Amino acid sequence: MKKGKMIQDIKTNTSWPVLISTLFYIFLASFFIEGGLWIGSELVGPFSLVIGFLVEFFSPGNGTASIQEFFYHYFLYYELFSFVIILLLFMFWVKVIEKNALSSLGFVKRNWLKYLGWGIMISLVQMGVIALVYQVSGIGSFELNELSLEPILFILGLFPFWLLQGGTEEVATRGWLLTRIAARTNLPFAIAISSSLFGILHMGNEGVTFLSVLNIILDGVLAGLLFIYTDSIWLVVAQHGTWNYVQGNLLGFQVSGTGADASIFRFTMGDGPDWLTGGAFGAEGSIITTLVLLVSLVIVYRLGERKERVDNEQVCHD
C-alpha cells in the first residue's frame, strides 16, 4: 500500500511526538462523534416542539394524535439526519483549524458517481450472500411483508439518510482519523487504529458480543482498504450507508443492535447460538458475516495491490 495524493497533501501542523498526536486524533474524533450525537439528542426537544406545532396547526382533527403518529413514523429520519452535526464539526475543524481542503477528507470530484455505484453494489452483494446463507441453512428466514404505498415510500425515502449516517461515520474514522494518523505514520497503523476505534464506538450497543465488535473492526479494515485504493471517500460512503439500509429496511435485521422500523422483508431468527444467528445485534454479530468480510478483504486487497502494480508499471514506462 502507498499513500495517495490525498494523504500526501495533508498539513498536520504539529511537531508533537507521534504517540501524542495519535492519542490526540483518537480523542478528538471520539469527542466530535459523541459530542455531535449529544447535540443531536438535545435538539430533539426544540425540534419536536416546532414540528409538533406545525402538525397540529395544519392537520385536521385531533392534533395530539397527529403529533404522536408523526413522531412514531418519522423519528428515524431525524435520528439519521442528526449525524449532519458530526459532519459539520469535522468540516469546521478541517477548514478553520487545520486550514486543509475538504478534499483531505476524501471529498474529491474524480469518479465520485462511479464510486457511489460500486459502493452500493458491494454492499448489495455482501448482504445478499449473508441473507442467502441464512435462508438456505435455516439460521433465519425472510418473508415478504404486505406493504401499502405509504410504508414503501417511507422505506425508499430513508436511503439518502442512511447514506448521510454511514457516510458521516466514514468521514470521521476514515476521512479524518485514518488520514491524519497516516500522514504522520504509516497506512497499516492508521487502518488498525481507525478500525479499532470504529469497533469500540459500537461496544455500547444492544446485544453486543466479542464477535460483533470483531466484525465491525473487520468492516473498518475493509473500508480502510477501499478508501486508500480509491483515494476517495465516496465508495465507502455508499458501501456503509447501503450496508445499514439493506440490513434494516430491506431484510429486517437489527442494525448494530438497533431496529430500523419498517422493512420490505420480515426476518424470523431460527434456533441457534448468538455467534451463528447474530442475536440481538443483528447479522453483524454472526460468524457468517465474519466469513463474508474476510473473503471481501482478500478480494479487495488483491485487486488493490494489482492496481498499484499496474500504476507503477505505467509510471516506469512514462
Specify the residue positions occupied by each region the protein language model found.
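Hydrophobic alpha-helical membrane-insertion segments
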Residues: Y25-E42, F81-S82, W118-Q126, I233-F253
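Functionally important transmembrane alpha-helices
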Residues: G35, S212-D274
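C-terminal membrane module of polytopic membrane proteins
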Residues: Y245-D318
